[in-house]
Structures are given as structure tokens and as C-alpha cells.
Amino acid sequence: MTFTVVGRCPKTKMLGVAMATHAPAVGNSCPVVIPRMAAASVQSIADPRLTLLCTKLMGLGYHAGKIIEELETSDPNAPLRQIGVVDAWGNAAAMTGSENGAYAGHILGDGWL
């Protein structure tokens, strides 16, 4: 089980990701932060190719919803994934695949998930 917070400070505009999980070394494969662009987590049977694509889309300035859409449509295993993104404008978007555990989901707020 993994708990993740992705957010943007409304005052400083800084972005960040925090994770708590049983899996070792997720910090090497799940979170992505590009300062002044976006922050994200690509998790639940993480695929490094998705993390790289997420990084590319963030760098191109895609908004959070479009990043989620692109990642979900490019991944044949999307039902196994959980992805969350907060962009530089404070937009939050997420998807939780249908094949995640019984206790899986996401909550979106203004500049956080």
C-alpha cells in the first residue's frame, strides 16, 4: 500500500511530492518534480517509461489533466496504475486504475492531491 501527496504551495508556487510505502526505493521510480512546471507520481506497479513520458509532458508545459490523459492512453496496463499530477497553475488531476487494490483511490483539491 502506498500513500502519496502531490502539491503546490499557493504562496511560493513550489511543488513537491511525498510518499509512504512498503516498497523499497520508490523515490527512484515514482515521483517527478520539475520546478515551476509540475509535480507527479506514477505508481502502483511503476513503469519507468511512464515516468519518463510524464517528465517529458511536464517539461512541454502540458496541464495536469492532459498529462493524465496522455499517460493513460499510452499505457496498455493503465488499469494497474495510479497517477497524480499537480501543474504550475495549481490544477490537480489523477487516475486510479480499476485493477488496483480494494483500498485505492484519490482525492483532488485546489493545488493538491
Regions inferred by a protein language model and the residue ranges of each:
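N-terminal nucleophile
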Residues: 1-113
